[in-house]
């Protein structure tokens, strides 16, 4: 910076010459359109300030300038000294290093500028489509072979014997020869023999066995015998099926067929594995493309996991499911929950093309009407899309039982009336469409003669339909032994036994149709076996519809789903084989997309118009891969289907280009796209892949339109040093990151414990992400532990080979050169890390450098997860998005165990001989970074700016989105009730007044939004102007809080100084439960709110959905995929507790005596509280693991304390390796306390059981009126606001509140807590920032006025045997239950889906009425008469003891 003598002179000149400038435009993401910018009031004029007026007029802005000056100097020192940016840039310039990815993007841009077809891009498209076609063809061949196997061979298998073990070798022949031979002998279609066969669902996992070699020998034989034994057991257990008998020759026949299918699946798995093994010889990294091969049997309804049951049911096309649900009083609470769970199971099996309707019946019947979809609600039928199913589930959860018995006849009458109306309107066709009628009931009849009336109603309803439908009945019971009459009645309904009741059906019965064709199935849903019976019944109930006329006769490629067991994203290819079942294979989505996921572009470059790729489902236009999507590897739940029209904002894409993509086999088209204020030309190249998918590569021009006015020179030397030319060879001291493997060499590296990582200080480690390999999928899924060591040794030998004789082990061609260049840069970082004179040696956790190709080197060397990708981390993305600046991330949790950390990063540009680099022109090829503790920046503030230590002065640092990096609260301990430290603490969380006022500065910050279509949300966030040149202060004058904000030049950080004696007044509404915005109908620039999200309301199946979501596309850009903040480390065989601590990582915290010295030191925390929240008389510096967040022995986000950390927590002044007898003694004490506590619990439990008849608990909410709890039945009497049919009262919640009253402040409970606000209590609507302090006395006053809810068994009898009432003043009167509580500050109340249906259906309960005035029984309300002036009333709690009551009462 300038010398002090010249500083004042320069500022004087600026004060004279400066003039007010116009509001500057905030540089936003380039994909934002002008419609996304929130306009400000035209009459509003922000405060215009010149640098001179800032310096001389406002003293607070002088403090901001001082803070900015200090931080700029420290960041400059970090960039040059700690990150060694200048030196590393010299290395890249001397070696003329450039990235192949960047070169390809340049070629695309230059080609498109001249409107010439890009030959390189077309070659890539051809190559990618061929690879994808081969993978899908291989899968389709397997599926077709399985189909032929079942279609022509099963009916003949029982004639052959498979018990001869000598024939095992003959079955090794190729499957094609066997199929041809059997097909020649039998070309007839399947016969009726399948009726006598009971086939089992069989699933073979194609995952390689990590513990054994690929030789199958005896292991496969044992597997076959095991499968046969399992088949026999399953067949024995399935004796309840009425269609097959296993006590005759059919049992042996079924066993033979099941054994044959199992053998063929094993042989097919062997052949696929052998094929992959042969491919791996030619390609060192070759993936196994199959997850499962399977046969889903129609006999058992695909009794497997949810995903397989969905595949089985999806074979039945265009289904219509009608639910008739009994909600009468015969159902207990448990049975009613069982009914809801069964409907939920069935809904999960339906796909988007299916239809659903629902009718509830008790003494009255009602159709399901969803408010969120009024168009469909008018007809009572809904498509089974994900949005509809979620709303239906919410509706079902809101149902409650009625107080009257069930009128079964009325339920069937309403159901058939609905079917007739839908048939007349053409929405269903019972003659051509599969209809599933399911009646879920207790089956209790008021009179045995009611069964005849029900069958007459059914017969009359069937008569009005074009074709009769099959009815399935489900009895929900607690015990199957006491349902004799109910079982007979429901069995008659399912079988439509009209003959038994002499009902004439000749007038409508189809001619030539057998009675068995209308026979449905009767199921028993028992509470005792709910975990197994519900899933199995939900899929088996579709068995009668598994007919050839309802099934598809082509291959089906299903949308990707996340496997609940493994977490993999799978794509299934299936084929129906009537009448046996479904055959198919599961493929990895990451395998199909490996070329597209690592296509040379990042999300930021895709948004800026550079090349990218996407993959579409040709039948639906839904997207499988796009730069807006995260990697399948980190996807945790199945996303909503996203049409490509939602993501592409090019001109004429939705109206013209999209149709061409889905219709034409191949082609290209060029159109215009507006990115911000720029007009670019975007070209789409596409190719159809076997008719299933459409692969599209996109390139955009317009790089010449960028502003290239400024250049920045980072290398101050005119001459470039000649670094060591031999960066290959054995002298390269570099280790592969797999430190858990013995990598050979002269001496194995010395491993140690670095926080929670296995690390080494001997050398830096090399990590190669999946993008560095030719087959990224093979790298991620072929990591067999036994072969991994050999693979690691081969990679390192190839990288060190200077002769060029060793073969490439599957790496991309440019990786070897990048490793050598990055190694030279790492030597600079390693020497700086080991320098004992370094001023930041105790603060820097680790240093690393990563290339855009996914090569990472770090020191100290650490073990990383194989799924780690440095190019997708937030520090890498932010540095690439802001090249030439030193970028800092918001605090996040370190996977290595260092707690909350901040990453400081800087880009390295491609090498140039003249060493001149421009942030606008040059391409970044690498990012160098280091990690520091989260409090590091606040330590820098205290060291460089003494003014920040004064009272009423706050100094803050926040990054370009408003997340705090430094705040005075970092000096205070974090607890659940005070100073909660979030991983991402935003400015609006901590400084509400500053956030409210700074939103008036249009040239400082914009409130923006983006669309996340995968979870159907609109994300709101803040974007700060990183080109700000002035210092901004208060817009509203006269406020008690004065502030000044300035940009720290050359970075993405902003400095703020607040001078205030009282921070009261302003607040920003933030939800304490989730991220949902409190007002989704309004988004104004000056409305302060925390970063939040709003749901998108819409249905992807409606005809107008495309235009509906396209409207979002025109207004908001798509959100980038979430950054991969935390990726857990892989488990190792080495125990961390047995490893010695790495030098410098432990044992130094006790040497710091003050908080200032302890602040920001890695692995250290200033310990101020014990685990009970009590302050220490003398605080001390301790290890972070033992005093996380300043609380001794508190739990960390990593889990429980291990033995060494627990020892350190109870002995903070003792080193961890010192011996202490606390372990054995403490263990004995804990065991003794547990034994005594258990004995006391047993004694009190028995005592409470004896005196339970005398204990009463009163609750105004539940109105038990003093009944003993042992005699109070929650199922017989309900709350006064419960509806008879479709109400909104939760019995489980009511019972919990009666026994455990919630007396917790909602403002002092973390968002992750299990606390839930009482249903009739006042809601705070998430205004957490309004009460930053402890509970006030006002709340205690209100507590006195509320009824007493006792939940502690240790109360005295005089307390528990009493009724608590209150005399209420007019201002303290409770609201009527029919009117929900409203908040005066909100125009629209954020209610959940369940609560919405509760409010609509709320009616008084017939159990016990409420007074006409709406008052609650047990509450005394003083009367009000007109407007006459009344004297003041006294508010006092009154306790009436039951010992005072008379016998008559």
Curated annotation (Swiss-Prot):
Glycans are attached at residues 32, 112, 153, 407, 447, 497, 649, 668, 707, 1015, 1025, 1059, 1111. The chain crosses the membrane at residues 1221-1241. Residues 1-23 form the signal peptide. It is a single-pass type I membrane protein. The keyword Cell membrane does not apply. Its main location: membrane. Residues 24-1220 are extracellular. SUPFAM superfamilies: Sensory domain-like (SSF103190), vWA-like (SSF53300). The keyword Lipid metabolism does not apply. Residues 320-541 form the VWFA domain. GO terms for molecular function: voltage-gated calcium channel activity. Residues 1359-1369 have a biased composition (Low complexity). Belongs to the calcium channel subunit alpha-2/delta family. This is VWFA and cache domain-containing protein CG16868.
């Amino acid at each position: 910076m300038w010398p002090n003598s010249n500083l004042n002179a320069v500022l004087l000149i600026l004060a004279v010459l400066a003039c007010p400038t116009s509001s500057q435009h905030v540089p936003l993401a380039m994909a934002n359109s002008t419609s996304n910018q929130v306009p400000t009031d035209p009459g509003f004029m922000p405060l215009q300030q010149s640098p001179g007026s800032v310096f001389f007029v406002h003293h607070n802005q002088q403090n901001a300038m001082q803070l900015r000056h200090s931080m700029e100097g420290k960041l400059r020192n970090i960039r040059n000294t700690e990150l060694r940016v200048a030196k590393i840039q010299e290395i890249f310039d001397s070696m003329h290093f450039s990235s192949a990815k960047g070169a390809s993007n340049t070629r695309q841009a230059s080609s498109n500028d001249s409107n010439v077809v890009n030959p390189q891009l077309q070659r890539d498209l051809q190559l990618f489509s061929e690879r994808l076609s081969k993978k899908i063809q291989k899968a389709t061949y397997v599926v077709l072979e399985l189909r032929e196997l079942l279609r022509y061979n099963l009916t003949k298998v029982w004639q052959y014997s498979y018990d001869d073990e000598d024939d095992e070798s003959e079955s090794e022949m190729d499957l094609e020869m066997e199929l041809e031979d059997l097909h020649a002998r039998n070309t007839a279609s399947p016969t009726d023999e399948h009726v006598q066969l009971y086939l089992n669902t069989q699933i073979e996992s194609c995952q390689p066995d990590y513990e054994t070699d690929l030789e199958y020998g005896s292991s496969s034989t044992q597997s076959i015998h095991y499968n046969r034994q399992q088949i026999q057991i399953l067949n024995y257990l399935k004796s309840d099926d009425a269609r097959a008998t296993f006590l005759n020759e059919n049992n042996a026949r079924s066993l033979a067929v099941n054994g044959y299918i199992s053998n063929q699946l094993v042989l097919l798995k062997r052949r696929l594995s052998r094929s992959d093994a042969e491919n791996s010889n030619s390609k060192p990294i070759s993936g196994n493309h199959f997850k499962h091969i399977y046969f889903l049997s129609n006999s058992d309804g695909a009794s497997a996991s949810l995903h397989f049951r969905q595949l089985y049911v999806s074979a039945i096309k265009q289904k219509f499911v009608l639910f008739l649900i009994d909600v009468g009083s015969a159902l207990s609470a448990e049975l009613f929950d069982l009914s809801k769970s069964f409907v939920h199971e069935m809904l999960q099996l339906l796909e988007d093309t299916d239809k659903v309707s629902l009718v509830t019946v008790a003494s009255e019947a009602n159709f399901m009407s969803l408010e969120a979809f009024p168009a469909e609600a008018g007809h009572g039928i809904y498509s089974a899309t994900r949005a509809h199913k979620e709303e239906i589930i919410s509706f079902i959860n809101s149902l409650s039982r009625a107080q009257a018995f069930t009128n079964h006849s009325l339920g069937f009458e309403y159901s058939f009336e609905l079917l007739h109306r839908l048939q007349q309107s053409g929405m269903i066709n019972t003659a051509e469409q599969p209809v599933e009628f399911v009646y879920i009931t207790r089956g209790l009849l008021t009179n045995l003669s009611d069964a005849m009336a029900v069958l007459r109603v059914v017969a009359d309803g069937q008569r009005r339909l074009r074709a009769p439908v099959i009815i399935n009945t489900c009895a929900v019971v607690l015990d199957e032994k006491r349902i004799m009459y109910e079982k007979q009645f429901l069995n008659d309904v399912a079988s439509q036994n009209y003959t038994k009741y002499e009902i004439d059906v000749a007038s409508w019965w189809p001619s030539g149709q057998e009675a068995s064709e209308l026979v449905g199935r009767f199921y028993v849903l028992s509470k005792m076996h709910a975990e197994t019976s519900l899933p199995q019944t939900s899929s088996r109930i579709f068995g009668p519809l598994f007919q050839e006329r309802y099934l598809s006769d082509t291959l089906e490629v299903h949308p990707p789903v996340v496997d609940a067991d493994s977490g993999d994203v799978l794509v299934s290819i299936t084929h129906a084989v009537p009448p046996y079942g479904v055959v198919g294979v599961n493929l990895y989505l990451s395998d199909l997309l490996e070329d597209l996921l690592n296509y040379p572009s990042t999300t930021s470059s895709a948004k800026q118009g550079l090349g990218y790729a996407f993959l579409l489902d040709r039948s639906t236009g839904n997207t499988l891969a796009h730069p807006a999507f995260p990697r399948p590897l980190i996807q945790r739940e199945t996303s909503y289907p996203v049409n490509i029209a939602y993501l592409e904002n090019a001109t004429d894409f939705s109206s013209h280009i999209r149709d061409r993509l889905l219709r034409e086999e191949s082609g290209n088209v060029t159109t215009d796209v507006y990115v911000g204020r720029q007009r670019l030309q975007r070209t789409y190249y596409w190719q159809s892949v076997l008719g299933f998918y459409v692969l599209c590569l996109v390139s955009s021009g317009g790089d010449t339109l960028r502003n290239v006015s400024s250049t920045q020179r980072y290398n101050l030397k005119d001459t470039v040093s000649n670094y060591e030319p031999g960066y290959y060879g054995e002298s390269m001291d570099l280790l592969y990151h797999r430190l858990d493997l013995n990598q050979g060499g002269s001496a194995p590296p010395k491993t140690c414990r670095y926080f929670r990582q296995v690390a080494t200080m001997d050398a830096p480690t090399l990590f190669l992400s999946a993008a560095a390999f030719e087959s990224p999928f093979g790298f991620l899924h072929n990591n067999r532990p036994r072969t991994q060591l050999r693979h690691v040794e081969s990679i390192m030998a190839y990288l060190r080979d200077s002769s060029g004789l060793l073969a490439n082990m599957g790496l991309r061609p440019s990786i070897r050169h990048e490793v050598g260049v990055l190694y030279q840069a790492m030597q600079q970082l390693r020497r700086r890390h080991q320098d004992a004179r370094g001023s930041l040696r105790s603060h820097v956790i680790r240093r690393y450098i990563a290339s855009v190709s996914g090569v990472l080197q770090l020191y100290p060397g650490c073990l990383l997860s194989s799924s780690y990708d440095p190019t997708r981390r937030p520090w890498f993305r932010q540095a690439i998005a802001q090249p030439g600046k030193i970028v800092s991330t918001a605090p996040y949790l370190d996977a290595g165990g260092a707690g909350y950390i901040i990453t400081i990063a800087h880009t390295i540009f491609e090498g140039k001989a003249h060493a001149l680099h421009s942030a606008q022109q040059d391409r970044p090829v690498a990012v160098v970074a280091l990690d520091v503790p989260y409090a590091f920046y606040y330590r820098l503030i205290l060291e460089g700016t003494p003014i920040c230590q004064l009272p009423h002065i706050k100094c803050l640092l926040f990054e370009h989105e408003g997340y705090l990096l430094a705040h005075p609260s970092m000096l205070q301990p974090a607890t659940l009730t005070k100073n909660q430290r979030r991983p991402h603490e935003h400015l609006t969380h901590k400084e509400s007044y500053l956030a409210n006022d700074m939103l008036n500065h249009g040239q400082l910050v914009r409130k923006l939004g983006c669309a996340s279509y995968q979870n159907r949300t609109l994300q709101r966030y803040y974007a700060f102007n990183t080109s700000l040149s002035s210092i901004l202060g208060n817009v509203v004058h006269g406020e008690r809080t004065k502030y000044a904000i300035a940009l720290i030049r050359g970075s993405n950080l902003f400095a703020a100084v607040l001078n205030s004696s009282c921070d009261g007044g302003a607040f920003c509404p933030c939800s304490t439960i989730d991220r949902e915005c409190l007002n989704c109908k309004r988004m104004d620039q000056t409305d302060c709110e925390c970063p939040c999200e709003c749901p998108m309301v819409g249905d992807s199946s409606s005809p107008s959905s495309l235009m509906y979501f396209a409207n979002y596309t025109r207004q908001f850009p798509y959100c980038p995929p979430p950054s991969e903040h935390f990726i857990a480390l892989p488990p190792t065989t080495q125990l961390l507790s047995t490893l010695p601590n790495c030098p410098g990582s432990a044992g130094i915290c006790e040497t710091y005596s003050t908080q200032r010295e302890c602040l920001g030191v890695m692995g250290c925390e200033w310990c101020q509280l014990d685990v009970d929240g009590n302050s220490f008389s003398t605080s001390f510096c301790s290890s972070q693991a033992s005093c996380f967040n300043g609380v001794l022995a508190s739990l960390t986000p990593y889990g429980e304390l291990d033995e060494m950390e627990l020892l350190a927590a109870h002995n903070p002044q003792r080193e961890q390796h010192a011996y202490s007898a606390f372990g054995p003694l403490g263990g004995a004490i804990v065991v003794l306390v547990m034994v005594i506590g258990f004995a006391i619990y047993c004694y009190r439990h028995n005592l409470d059981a004896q005196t339970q008849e005398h204990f009463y608990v009163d609750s105004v909410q539940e109105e038990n009126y003093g009944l003993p709890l042992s005699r109070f039945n929650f199922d017989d009497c309900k709350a006064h606001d419960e509806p008879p049919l479709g109400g909104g009262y939760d019995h489980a919640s009511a019972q919990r509140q009666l026994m455990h009253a919630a007396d917790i402040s909602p403002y002092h409970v973390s968002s992750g807590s299990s606390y839930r606000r009482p249903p009739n209590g006042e809601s705070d609507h998430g205004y957490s920032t309004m009460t930053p302090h402890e509970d006030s006395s006002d709340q205690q006053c209100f507590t006195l006025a509320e009824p007493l809810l006792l939940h502690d068994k240790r109360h005295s009898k005089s307390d528990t045997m009493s009724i608590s009432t209150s005399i209420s003043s007019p201002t303290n009167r409770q609201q009527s239950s029919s009117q929900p509580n409203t908040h005066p500050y909100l125009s629209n109340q954020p209610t959940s889906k369940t609560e919405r249906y509760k409010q609509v259906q709320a009616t008084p309960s017939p159990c016990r009425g409420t007074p006409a005035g709406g008052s609650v029984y047990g509450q005394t309300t003083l009367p009000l008469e007109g407007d006459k002036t009344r004297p003041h009333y006294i508010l006092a709690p009154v306790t009436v003891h039951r010992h005072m009551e008379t016998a008559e009462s």
